C-alpha cells in the first residue's frame, strides 16, 4: 500500500507539472514565474542593465487596446514615424483580429530620444481581409518615398504574403501584392543597396512536443528577395542563406552602415540552460553583422540584461544604436500594470563599437 501511495503521489505531481507547463505557455502568473526561474542565470550575461530601459507611451487605438508589439521606426529629419500593431493576447481569440498596423508619430526634440507617440490616424492601415491576420509591418524610404510592407499570414493560396503601400499626403495607397510564398517568410527586413532593395525574411519551425509551448523553435534559413523595378511592383527570389548559430532568429530589423550589414533580432539561444538543466527558451536581444549580407557573426552577449524580448527596431546616430523593442508578455506583474496583456515597448541606447562578435 505504501508503494501504491508513493506512485499515486508521483503521478499526481506529474499531472500538476504538465498542467503548469501548459498554463505557463500563456500570459499569466505561471508564465511570469517560469520566465523568472528559467532566465535567472542567463539574464546577467547581457551588456546593458535593464534599469536603463525607457518605457514608451502609445495612444490607445480605436478599440481601446494599448497592447503594442511589432514596432518599426523610420527617422525622417526631425520626425519619427512608427508603425506597430495592437496585440491583446488575453482576448479569447488571442487578439489576432486586432493585429493590424497603426501609424504613430513623435517629434524629436534636440538630441532627446523619443518615448511618447501619438496616433496619426485612429484607423488601421490595412485589414486582414482573406488572411488569418496581419503581422510584421516594416517602414522604409525608397527614392524619397515612404513605404510600408506588411505580412499577411495564412490566406487561401499562401502561408505568407507581403503587401506594399505608399504613404502619400497623409494617406496610404491601396495595397499591392509583391511576394507570396508557402513558407513562414516571417518579419520582412529591408535593406537598400544602390538600385536594389533587398528583403530578408525568416523561416523557422517549432520543435517537437508543441515546441513553442515548451521547447522552442529553430531558424531553418533566411530568404532574400530583390526588386525588379523602381516602382517596387515586382520582386524576385534571390537565395536562401543558412543560419548555423545557436541564437535562433525570430523577429528582426536590419540596417547597413560603414560597409557592414547589421541584423538586430530577438531569439532564444539553444546553448542557454536553466540552472536545473532544461533549455531556456525565452527570447533575448541580439545583433549580428556581415560583410556580404550572407555570412553573419552574432554578438557574444545579449545586448540587454532582460529576457522576454519580442520584435526590435532601431536607428543609428553618431554610432549610437537607439533600440526600441516590444516585450513578449512574460513579465506579467510589471508590464501588465501598464498594458493589459504585458506587450509594451521599451527603448535603450548602446554604442555600436562596444559590441563584440563571435569569430
Where are these regions (language model features)?
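Feature marks short, highly hydrophobic, charge-poor N-terminal signal-anchor/signal peptide-like helices
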Residues: 1-10
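Alpha-helical transmembrane segments
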Residues: 15-21
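Transmembrane-helix exit/juxtamembrane "anchor" motif
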Residues: 23-27
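N-terminal leader/targeting signatures
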Residues: 9-13, 292
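Exposed aromatic-hydrophobic patches
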Residues: 312-313
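A short mid-domain helix/strand-loop element embedded in enzyme catalytic domains
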Residues: 136
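Beta-rich carbohydrate-recognition and catalytic domains
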Residues: 19, 29-132, 140-250, 255-307, ...
Amino acid at each position: 500500500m505504501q508503494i501504491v501511495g508513493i506512485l499515486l503521489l508521483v503521478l499526481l505531481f506529474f499531472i500538476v507539472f504538465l498542467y503548469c507547463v501548459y498554463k505557463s505557455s500563456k500570459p499569466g502568473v505561471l508564465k511570469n514565474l517560469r520566465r523568472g526561474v528559467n532566465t535567472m542565470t542567463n539574464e546577467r550575461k547581457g551588456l546593458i542593465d535593464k534599469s536603463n530601459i525607457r518605457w514608451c507611451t502609445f495612444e490607445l487605438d480605436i478599440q481601446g487596446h494599448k497592447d503594442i508589439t511589432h514596432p518599426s521606426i523610420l527617422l525622417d529629419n526631425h520626425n519619427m514615424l512608427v508603425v506597430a500593431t495592437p496585440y491583446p493576447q488575453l482576448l479569447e481569440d488571442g487578439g489576432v483580429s486586432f493585429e493590424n498596423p497603426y501609424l504613430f508619430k513623435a517629434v524629436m526634440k534636440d538630441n532627446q530620444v523619443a518615448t511618447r507617440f501619438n496616433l496619426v490616424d485612429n484607423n488601421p492601415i490595412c485589414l486582414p481581409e482573406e488572411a488569418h491576420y496581419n503581422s510584421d509591418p516594416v517602414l522604409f524610404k525608397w527614392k524619397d518615398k515612404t513605404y510600408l510592407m506588411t505580412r499577411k499570414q495564412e490566406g487561401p493560396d499562401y502561408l505568407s504574403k507581403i503587401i506594399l503601400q505608399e504613404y502619400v499626403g497623409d494617406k496610404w495607397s491601396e495595397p499591392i501584392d509583391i511576394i507570396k510564398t508557402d513558407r513562414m517568410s516571417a518579419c520582412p527586413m529591408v535593406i537598400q543597396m544602390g538600385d536594389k532593395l533587398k528583403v530578408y525574411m525568416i523561416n523557422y519551425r517549432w520543435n517537437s512536443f508543441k515546441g513553442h509551448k515548451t521547447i522552442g523553435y529553430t531558424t531553418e534559413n533566411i530568404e532574400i528577395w530583390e526588386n525588379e523595378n523602381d516602382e517596387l511592383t515586382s520582386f524576385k527570389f534571390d537565395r536562401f542563406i543558412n543560419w548555423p548559430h545557436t541564437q535562433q532568429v525570430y523577429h528582426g530589423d536590419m540596417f547597413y552602415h560603414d560597409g557592414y550589414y547589421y541584423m538586430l533580432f530577438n531569439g532564444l539561444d539553444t546553448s542557454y540552460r536553466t540552472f536545473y538543466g532544461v533549455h531556456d527558451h525565452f527570447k533575448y536581444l541580439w545583433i549580428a553583422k556581415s560583410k556580404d549580407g550572407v555570412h553573419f557573426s552574432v554578438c557574444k552577449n545579449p545586448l540587454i540584461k532582460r529576457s522576454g524580448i519580442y520584435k526590435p527596431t532601431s536607428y543609428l546616430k553618431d554610432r549610437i544604436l537607439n533600440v526600441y523593442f516590444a516585450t513578449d508578455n512574460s513579465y506579467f506583474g510589471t508590464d501588465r500594470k501598464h498594458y493589459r496583456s504585458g506587450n509594451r515597448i521599451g527603448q535603450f541606447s548602446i554604442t555600436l563599437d562596444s559590441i563584440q562578435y563571435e569569430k
